[in-house]
Regions:
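P-loop NTP-binding module
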Residues: 2-168
């Protein structure tokens, strides 16, 4: 989640493009709380209560950045991500403008089938792994799943290794 937030903020600050950060970790949504936002509505409201997406989107204090927050835990997250309404939302957000970048924050790949369910709606995947937490077997399983995707890179998170002092 922090990697998705940092990526979205960086893209919004470095480009003349709008960036929409969508919290699709529906089992453990954290984007709004990490950004200090208090949403009146969330993606759950859009998906289950017919709240228009315009009422869900928030504008934090970062120029060019919009956030579609999650708010409460949804037990049927895979079903929600596979729904027609989610497909329409993904298409709507992506086609908002040719210069709009949409960053989807997803739950861990192997903990639920949410990412697999949502894969048809993404153009590219940035894989985040945690040093000393992600197992080799999980990396191998994930690599098999990514063969069908445009994997643009891997981020090593929680690294404690330091560069040599003569690095620069």
């Amino acid at each position: 989640t922090l990697t998705a937030i940092n990526l979205a903020i960086s893209l919004a600050q470095e480009s003349n493009q709008e960036v929409i950060l969508v919290d699709l970790d529906l089992r453990t949504p954290r984007v709004a709380s990490y950004l200090g936002l208090n949403p009146q509505f969330s993606l759950a409201d859009y998906l289950t209560n017919d709240v228009p997406i315009e009422k869900v989107l928030l504008k934090p204090d970062v120029p060019g950045l919009y956030v579609a927050p999650g708010a409460e835990r949804l037990e049927q997250s895979s079903e929600m991500l596979a729904s027609h309404k989610m497909a329409v939302l993904a298409q709507t957000l992506v086609s908002t403008s040719p210069s709009t970048i949409v960053v989807f924050d997803m739950p861990p790949l192997l903990e639920a089938d949410d990412m697999l369910t949502f894969m048809p709606h993404v153009d590219a995947v940035l894989f985040v792994v945690a040093q000393l937490e992600t197992q080799q077997s999980d990396l191998e399983r994930s690599n098999e799943l990514f063969k069908e995707l445009n994997l643009i890179g891997t981020v090593l998170n929680k690294s404690r290794d330091e560069a040599p002092s003569n690095y620069y």
